[in-house]
Amino acid sequence: VKHAFIFAACGFAGLTACGDDPKTGANDVDATEEVAPEITPDVTLEEVEVDEEVARPTGPRANVYPVAPGVSPALVQVELKHLNEPNDTMTGAFAHVQSCSADLDRGKRSKLTFGPTTVEIVSCVPEQKVKPGADGTYLHIVPPATPAEDDGRFAEVMMYHHMQVIHDYFKDVYGLTERDHPLEALTNVATWIDRCETWAGVTNAAFVPALGLAFFVEGLDVTSLRGDAIIFSGTAERNFSFDASVIYHEYTHAMVGATRLSGTFVDNQGLNSLPGALNEAYADYFSATQTGEPTIGVYALTDLAASDFCGVTDDTAATENYARDLRAVRRCPDDLVSEVHSDSEIFSSALWAIREEFGARQADTIVLYAALELTDTSDFNAASDLTIQGANDLYGADVSAKVEAIFAARNLIGCDRIMPIDKVGSRDFELRVEGTRVFDPNPYPGYVPGYLQYGVVVPPGTKRAKITLDASAGGFASNGQPLEVDAVVKRGAEPVFYTYGLGAGSATNDGDYTFTIVDKAFVIQNPNNVPLAPGAWTFALHNKARRTLRISAITATFE
């Protein structure tokens, strides 16, 4: 969800066969078909089930929050579906849930080295704690007074139940069976750090593919995890497993994003991280449409206390909010920051607007139809085009036109990744240009371009333009080392385009000028004091150092 852990069918024809006529409105449904209840901001799926007598739990029962403490503070009674017989742990056909116990005697011990410093850490111990009561239910398990007092049992119950809710949504409504096997889930993750003398959790959760578990967190005991996993931590104030919106988000990564929309690729504008942003956008959207709440992490990601190496600090006044509100309209490229969670808000705001326009059922169908066609090299342009086409295929030209207008309002159709320099830093994020160590072999000759390029408007009569970067090389412990950066400048509003040949170092670009940045600045000036062409200019930054370049602001002065 947030980036603090050491972390990120029916088939298309069958989408229409699961309750939606491809050329009718959202409410035109065959009365003989079983239709899932419409989920609105005021009605959750659990509330629909509890309010209808025929849907009351008949199997193993438990108390859960429909969404999260403070969002839906009253507990509801639910059936824990798909549990294996004899129902003695949170293991079923589609989930294997454990919580992680803080136990210094049984925890796995290891050492981590950071330069001259070595610390010893002890992993928490994964185990299943939930057991049914004498009546065969789990109603005796209730939320702890505070997350700090949680023994793992309520976290396991919350996790298990909401995994079934989102699994059954994808399967029963849309026929997706990719997760028809037990997905691993681990709650309450924390580690003991000897220099801190405390158990430290983090404000995060993550979906981790099976192949990535060994590299996920050094020292974490993952031996009991038998495949892909969703892993949740938290603090004494926030247990991320208590927030259904976070569970749905991570489960959607497992369902929709596990085989597509991962990583970064190179294209004709440099490095493109937007597949990861789309992965986050779809995870946010399907979480929000399931809860009916357009903000992801109202409980888990709001008023988070400041943290450091040892966990939450004593500075209770230093809190931050990372909840993502899908109603907040953002635009490409002005709001891009080359961080996938933040960049995702541009696209997810469009998806939520589609839901507001057409309702949950019709919008979900349009959105999923497109998402299942995407690949690891799909970006905002591709996803917008596929969603518009999907709306046309499923519901006709009028619906498609409205979807296109929603994307156009956010400049998501044909958006070049050129950020106006006055927007750099506007979202309080440092922009990154990766170092050469990220590529081996490197397709670029001795440099790495950024995820973004930058636009500047030169006034008429300008003879000299000076571009200054507020930037640092290397980030943590950089010690003020000088930048090793070139600026490739191009006249006009088009991006600098890259072309790739065969082998390492074969990339070329169509920039007009290349300047070496000295003292964090470069100057554009014609010979003989000839004025520069007025209007839009574009430049790309090429990092020639091994470590990351971080940019807080870019300014321009004209003479």
Pin down the residues of each PLM region:
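Zymogen propeptides/activation segments of proteases
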Residues: C18-I247, A254-P449, R464-K466, A471-P482, ...
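Solvent-exposed serine/threonine-rich low-complexity stretches and specific carbohydrate-binding patches
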Residues: Y498-T514
